[in-house]
């Protein structure tokens, strides 16, 4: 399943939330690449184990619309079906933009996920972590907001 992981730069490095998603994607053997968003000129986000595209945004603007447009183009051109981001302000904004662009709902509060016969199965936390439920996502484009551990 072709996958896009949306990451962020934190203090010059790829965020821990993105690294968690990358590790899980590698564990599942997903074909993925990372799009990293940040305001820095030369962040330390390289890796030999995955492709990374750095999207520099303007730190004086609140809107991530231009970044979302670039991500939409990536998803379209590469036939990506699974898009994931850490549950941060940037991750939530970008997943929201993309889910509207592709008319597909997002699943939030994901604490774990698996792939079964081309579908994504998520475990989600609700009620402050007191309850957990599972979702089976069958849509063409699957949008997940992953809660950090």
List each language-model region with its residue ranges.
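N-terminal glycine-rich FAD/FM-binding segment characteristic of electron-transfer flavoproteins
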Residues: 1-149
């Amino acid at each position: 399943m072709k996958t896009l992981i949306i990451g962020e730069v934190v203090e010059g490095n790829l965020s821990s939330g993105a690294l968690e998603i990358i590790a899980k994607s590698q564990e599942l053997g997903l074909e993925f690449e990372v799009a990293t968003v940040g305001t820095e000129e030369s962040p330390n986000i390289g890796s030999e184990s995955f492709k990374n595209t750095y999207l520099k945004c303007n730190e004086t603007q609140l809107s991530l619309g231009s970044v979302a447009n670039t991500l939409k183009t990536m998803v379209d051109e590469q036939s990506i079906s699974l898009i994931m981001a850490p549950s941060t302000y940037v991750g939530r904004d970008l997943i929201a933009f993309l889910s509207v662009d592709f008319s597909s709902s997002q699943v939030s509060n994901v604490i774990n996920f698996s792939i079964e016969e081309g579908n994504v199965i998520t475990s989600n936390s609700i009620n402050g972590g007191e309850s957990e439920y599972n979702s089976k996502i069958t849509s063409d484009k699957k949008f997940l907001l992953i809660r950090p551990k």
